[in-house]
C-alpha cells in the first residue's frame, strides 16, 4: 500500500543532491501509451530524466509504474509514443538492444540462482557484456578474468565478505544488494530500479538508501518505491502517476504539497 499520508503531512524534509544543471536528457518518453485489451495502463506519458539525476516514479498500486518501466526497457511494446535514450530512438527495441545502449534495470522480485555464489553471479553478468555473451556452462577458468572486477562490485554493495556464499543463503536485503551489483556490472548510463526497498525492514531500507547513493554517482537513476522516506532521501525529481497518467512532477518538496496530489490521495480522509 502506498503510504501517502506519511509523505504529505508534516515531517522534516531530507536533504538530497541538487538537480543537475545544464545537462542533456538521458531518457525521454513522449506520448507513451500502452493498452491491454481495452484497458489503458499507461496513458500518453511524457517524461524527461536528466543525465546524472535521480528520478522517482511514485503512485498507488495500479498507477502504471511497472508497466512504464517495462516500456522504457523493452520488455513491453508500446501501443503509441516514442522512447529515446541520449537521442537514440529505442522505441520497440528488444531488452538486450536497449541494454547495449546503456540502460539496465532491476525487478520487483529477486531472481537469482540459489546455488551460485554472488561472485559467480557477477562474473556471469560481466561476461554477458562482452561479445562472448552469456555462456552458462563454461569452466571456472573462463570466468577468472572477471574475478577482480566482480569482487570490486560486490565490495561496493557491501557483499565483499559474502562473495563465496551461495545466493540461496543470503538474507533478503543482501539478495537485493546482489541484484544491484548485477545491474552495475552492465556499466549502464541509465539505471532503473523497481522498488529496491520492497519488503525490507528499517535497517535494510537505510542501508539500501546509502547503497543507491553510491551506485548513482556518475549515473542516471530512475526508481520506483512506495516508501516516501526513500523517495525523499534520494530523488531530486519526482513524477506522480495516477491511473496511468502523469498527475504531477517536481521536486520532492514541491510534489508533496501539490494540491492535485493532496486532493487525489488525501481528499477523502480530509473530508471525513
Model feature map: region roles:
Residues 2, 8-272:
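Glycine-rich phosphate-binding loops of nucleotide-dependent enzymes
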Amino acid at each position: 500500500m502506498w503510504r501517502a499520508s506519511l509523505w504529505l503531512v508534516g515531517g522534516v524534509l531530507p536533504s538530497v543532491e541538487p538537480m543537475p544543471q545544464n545537462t542533456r536528457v538521458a531518457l525521454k518518453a513522449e506520448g507513451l501509451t500502452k493498452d491491454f485489451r481495452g484497458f489503458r495502463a499507461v496513458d500518453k506519458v511524457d517524461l524527461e530524466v536528466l543525465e546524472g539525476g535521480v528520478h522517482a516514479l511514485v503512485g498507488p498500486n495500479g498507477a502504471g509504474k511497472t508497466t512504464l518501466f517495462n516500456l522504457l526497457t523493452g520488455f513491453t511494446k508500446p501501443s503509441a509514443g516514442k522512447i529515446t535514450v541520449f537521442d537514440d530512438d529505442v522505441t520497440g527495441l528488444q531488452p538486450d538492444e536497449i541494454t547495449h545502449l546503456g540502460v539496465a534495470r532491476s525487478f520487483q522480485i529477486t531472481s537469482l540462482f540459489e546455488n551460485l555464489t554472488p561472485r559467480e553471479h557477477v562474473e556471469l553478468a560481466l561476461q554477458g557484456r562482452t561479445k562472448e555473451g552469456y555462456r552458462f556452462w563454461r569452466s571456472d577458468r573462463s570466468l577468472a578474468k572477471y574475478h577482480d572486477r566482480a569482487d570490486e562490485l560486490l565490495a561496493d554493495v557491501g557483499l565483499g565478505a559474502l562473495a563465496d556464499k551461495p545466493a540461496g543463503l543470503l538474507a533478503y536485503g543482501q539478495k537485493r544488494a546482489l541484484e544491484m551489483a548485477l545491474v552495475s556490472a552492465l556499466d549502464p548510463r541509465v539505471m532503473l530500479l523497481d522498488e529496491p526497498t520492497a519488503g525490507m525492514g528499517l535497517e535494510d531500507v537505510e542501508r539500501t538508501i546509502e547503497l543507491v547513493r553510491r551506485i548513482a554517482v556518475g549515473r542516471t537513476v530512475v526508481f520506483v518505491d512506495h516508501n516516501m522516506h526513500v523517495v525523499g532521501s534520494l530523488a531530486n525529481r519526482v513524477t506522480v502517476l495516477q491511473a496511468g497518467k502523469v498527475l504531477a512532477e517536481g521536486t520532492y518538496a514541491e510534489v508533496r504539497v501539490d494540491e492535485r496530489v493532496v486532493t487525489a490521495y488525501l481528499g477523502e480522509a480530509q473530508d471525513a
